[in-house]
Amino acid sequence: MALSGIELLDHAHRLDSFDCGKPALNAWLAGFARTNQARGFTRVPVVHDEGTVVGYYGLAPGVIQPNSAPRAIRTGRPPDPIPCLLIGQLAVDHRYAGQGVGSGLVKDALYRCVAGADIVGGRAVVVRAIDAEAERYWQSWGFIPARDNPSVLMRSIQDVSLWLADKGH
């Protein structure tokens, strides 16, 4: 096993054996990740084992409605809608679970979100949890549910930036 660093998905990466145990996330990687990235909708950083993708996430710009956002995100008279960065998917092949691949991908995503917000603006990092297990996972990273939808979770860019600096990540 020789895990790569995190790099953008390309045509050399093999996707056919990826299985995170969640069919929707498997299907998105196989059916949409390359096309969405090529069309500029999403960036898809991956970790691979000798070319076979073992973990990935999708990153895209997005917006949230102020009435959905927690107070920490909607203070200071933000625009309507509020610009954000969306971690649209996050998955690790079940054969690589518990090896730090997911944590590494989350930290990379958070760094990229802070860097992106420094360039184009953005008030929050937003995730859309696929199920209750994913909701709990993102809450363990300090994300809080939207006021109107517990499957949409967010964390302010300022909070993420401070957390990354404080933890020495």
Feature annotation, model-predicted:
Residues V114, V120-G121, R128-D148:
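Conserved active-site alpha-helix within GNAT-family acetyltransferase domains
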Residues G98-R112:
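Conserved acetyl-CoA-binding loop-helix of GNAT-fold acetyltransferases
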Residues G88-G98:
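A short, internal acetyl-CoA/4′-phosphopantetheine-binding micro-motif in the GNAT/acyltransferase core
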Residues M1-T35, R39, V44:
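Short amphipathic alpha-helix that is part of the acyltransferase structural core
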Residues T42, Y56-Q89:
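Conserved acyl-donor/pantetheine-binding loop and adjacent beta-alpha core of acyl/acetyltransferases
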Residues V106, D131-A134, P150-I157:
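Short glycine/proline-centered loop/turn elements that form peptide/ligand docking sites
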Residues H48-V53:
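A glycine-centered beta-loop-beta connector
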